[in-house]
Amino acid sequence: MSLTRLLIRDFRNIETADLALSPGFNFLVGANGSGKTSVLEAIYTLGHGRAFRSLQIGRVIRHEQEAFVLHGRLQGEERETAIGLTKDKQGDSKVRIDGTDGHKVAELAHLMPMQLITPEGFTLLNGGPKYRRAFLDWACFHNEPGFFTAWSNLKRLLKQRNAALRQVTRYEQLRPWDKELIPLAEQISTWRAEYSAGIAADMADTCKQFLPEFSLTFSFQRGWEKETEYAEVLERNFERDRLLTYTAHGPHKADLRIRADGAPVEDTLSRGQLKLLMCALRLAQGEFLTRESGRRCLYLIDDFASELDDERRGLLASRLKATQSQVFVSAISAEHVIDMSDENSKMFTVEKGKITD
């Protein structure tokens, strides 16, 4: 599915824009601060309900306006889908799909699987386990119909359990929460483990292309001891959890550990190499989704030329073209992306929030 039309109103520094898009490569060229990243962020927000540069809604809505409005048209193989998102300064959202209100942001996310590559995206590799859990959970969300409900219930139960830990004195008082929590934790961990095992070879092969000088390994850690039942872990660690007032073990502590030549990648790779690894992982994940489900990602790439030499830029471009996916690329100069352009691509110029093609 590709985004054929994008309407933006009062988002960041963009007052209004109406863009007809290519199903292939779309280039956004402009100086720093021109608004090219804001276009990428508008697309991301339309599919996620939140921006990727700021969680504060007031910074995303254009100055002195009350709300932003985003609309898009998605073209699938058999039908077109109209989608829309409005969000005001209070954080209240309205999601519209095919002319009807009352939809959830998760429905937009399901319609628009995306891979985001930004200069800030190093957090996937050096920002702690929660970013790698998000990497795994993105895939589980798009591959397992029951994942989102299970994940939402898990978060709710963990919050309730942590609150209860401040009040209880005996483990038996926690059993009502743990009775619900344990099967959810085990199911989510199973989904994550199955996905990690399934994509491991793809990640290794793609990383080998981008970083042939390193031997990269990937290891899923579920968040509690291997070969131990989660029920046993919760009961055994009750006193420790009660002192900490939070649940110290579980799927909320899971990680995907990535090592280069046996050492953590954040301690081994340069910034340029970390960006290559990030690109490789995002690409592998998108390709895996297509192979498993037939669905294609949208790829959003901010500041394409940053920290990549000509050879690696060419490699990334050729791999992206091979996916036959829709790609949005921002760059300071058209020279950085001209060799990626073909007869089906579109080049947009962005200047002070105004977008022309």
UniProtKB/Swiss-Prot annotation:
Query: Which positions are annotated as binding ATP?
Result: 30-37
- A GO biological process held by the record: DNA replication
Alphabetical keyword list: ATP-binding, Cytoplasm, DNA damage, DNA repair, DNA replication, DNA-binding, Nucleotide-binding, SOS response
Q: Does the keyword Glycoprotein apply?
A: no
Subcellular compartments: Cytoplasm
SUPFAM superfamilies cross-referenced by the UniProt entry: P-loop containing nucleoside triphosphate hydrolases
Q: Entry's InterPro entries?
A: DNA-binding_RecF (IPR001238), DNA-binding_RecF_CS (IPR018078), P-loop_NTPase (IPR027417), RecF/RecN/SMC_N (IPR003395), RecF_2 (IPR042174)
One Gene Ontology CC term in the entry: cytoplasm
**Keyword Transferase among UniProt keywords:** no
Single GO MF descriptor: ATP binding
Functional summary from the UniProt entry: The RecF protein is involved in DNA metabolism; it is required for DNA replication and normal SOS inducibility. RecF binds preferentially to single-stranded, linear DNA. It also seems to bind ATP.
Concerning its family, UniProt says: Belongs to the RecF family.
What this protein is called in its record is: DNA replication and repair protein RecF
Which organism encodes this protein?
A: Shigella boydii serotype 18 (strain CDC 3083-94 / BS512)
